[in-house]
Regions:
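Cysteine-centered metal-binding/redox modules
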Residues: 2-128, 132-152
Length: 152
């Protein structure tokens, strides 16, 4: 049954998300090295509703679908003691929307600075890093919007 739910999620998302398999592979890598994943369940999220991207849900715990691990903002290599939080896709989307806005503001600031002072290797490198991060955030926002359409 666990695999069935995962396959249904894959079918629904693979049609609407370009390079879905790459994102799925990245999510699997993140899940396998995340400090909150104990090999069976995600210990960061508490699940009280069944409308979340999980391969399996049992006793308020979930086996996260790899695409959930791809968009998870709590991914960590170190375990931080803290309470479990209720999984809410809208909260995660809001987090990424705010992050996107912050990155865009910093990009504008850097571009203005580059226009004023001329070429700066440090500013150019920071700008490239921010553009890469922005692309990653935009991808996660698109994935989250698709997940919300499916699981609302």
């Amino acid at each position: 049954m666990e695999r069935f739910r995962e396959i249904l999620i894959d079918i629904a998302l693979s049609k609407t998300i370009p390079n879905y398999q790459d994102l799925l592979d990245e999510g699997k890598k993140r899940r396998d090295i995340c400090a909150y994943f104990d090999g069976k369940y995600c210990n960061k999220f508490k699940v009280s509703r069944g409308n979340v991207p999980a391969s399996w849900i049992s006793n308020n715990k979930m086996v996260p679908h790899p695409i959930m691990c791809f968009v998870c903002p709590y991914f960590s290599l170190r375990y931080y003691e803290g309470k479990q939080i209720e999984l809410d896709l809208f909260d995660i989307l809001l987090y990424y929307e705010e992050l996107k806005e912050t990155i865009e503001k910093e990009l504008i600031f850097i571009e203005n600075k580059m226009n004023e002072t001329g070429f700066s290797l440090l500013l150019k490198r920071r700008r490239e890093e921010l553009i890469s991060l922005l692309n990653d955030v935009v991808t996660k926002i698109k994935v989250l919007k698709e997940l919300i359409k499916i699981f609302r």
